[in-house]
Amino acid sequence: MNALTSLKLIDGKATAARVLAEVREQVQELRQGGVQPGLVVVLVGADAASQVYVRNKVLRAEEVGIRSQEHRLPADTTQAHLLTLIDRLNRDPEVNGILVQLPLPAHIDEHCVLQAINPLKDVDGFHSENVGGLAQGRDVLTPCTPSGCMRLLRDACGELRGKHAVVVGRSNIVGKPMAALLLQADCTVTVVHSRSRDLPALCRQADILVAAVGKPRLIGADCLKPGAVVIDVGINRINEDGQNHLVGDVDFAAALPQVAGITPVPGGVGPMTIAYLMKNTLLALDLQQQAAHQERTACLSPC
């Protein structure tokens, strides 16, 4: 890596390490007060990639002092059985965060399962209560990847107010919540998608460009304004010169001379996603404690 690349690189690994250190310190303070946050990860089936993701999440939780559990269910698990497990976890006071690893087997209704999770324990931020709360600017659990991207942007850019942000992709997991978080930060936001016309012209307006479409090297130099900051959420496996490579949605080599900062793939956004899962577990605990306090206060109030 040359000096120019180093200067422009937005290092997700280093930032994630700082986030995890912050979480570890908060967890230590909580444990001194007799409280240990708890995270449960549920995996249905034996998808190899999902197994790796789940293991990484559990390991990170253990590293920062969060009590973690795995529930590994066979691929033929019924929806009713999965919903029963979620109901039990919802009622368990020692469980602060619940994550159901996606994708689920085809016979299980993903929407139904995600809606069954208590919104205050929904550390993925996918429940409609949290999605709506994000749109309204309320203090709710938000999806981990967009939240991690916002930390990278604030560290790289400082003040975001007034900047023009272009989000390429409109998925429920990244694109839409990313746009909502950027709006909350007082950015001017454009969302570009598969039906948008003249992708390069729209992208060239961006002070901040977030690419999240899952198309290798879709964003070339012709899509970038000089001095833009680029967050590449895409992670695509391609075969090139007889070897497998992981590349982003942005053509890194073509983009580098033009941008002020860019995340690499791998090592950019990925580590931030898991780091913000840990932060969300602490936020979930805090929201649950607030809700319990409000409930106690309401019970003590005169009619």
Curated annotation (Swiss-Prot):
GO terms for molecular function: methenyltetrahydrofolate cyclohydrolase activity; methylenetetrahydrofolate dehydrogenase (NADP+) activity. It catalyses: (6R)-5,10-methylene-5,6,7,8-tetrahydrofolate + NADP(+) = (6R)-5,10-methenyltetrahydrofolate + NADPH; (6R)-5,10-methenyltetrahydrofolate + H2O = (6R)-10-formyltetrahydrofolate + H(+). One of its GO terms (biological process) is tetrahydrofolate interconversion. It comes from the Bacteria. NADP(+) binds at residues 169-171, 194, 235. GO terms for cellular component: cytosol. Pathway: One-carbon metabolism; tetrahydrofolate interconversion. Its EC number is 1.5.1.5, 3.5.4.9. Keywords: Amino-acid biosynthesis, Histidine biosynthesis, Hydrolase, Methionine biosynthesis, Multifunctional enzyme, NADP, One-carbon metabolism, Oxidoreductase, Purine biosynthesis. It holds the Pfam family THF_DHG_CYH_C. Homodimer. NCBIfam families: PRK10792.1, PRK14186.1, PRK14188.1, PRK14194.1. Catalyzes the oxidation of 5,10-methylenetetrahydrofolate to 5,10-methenyltetrahydrofolate and then the hydrolysis of 5,10-methenyltetrahydrofolate to 10-formyltetrahydrofolate. Belongs to the tetrahydrofolate dehydrogenase/cyclohydrolase family. This is Bifunctional protein FolD 2.
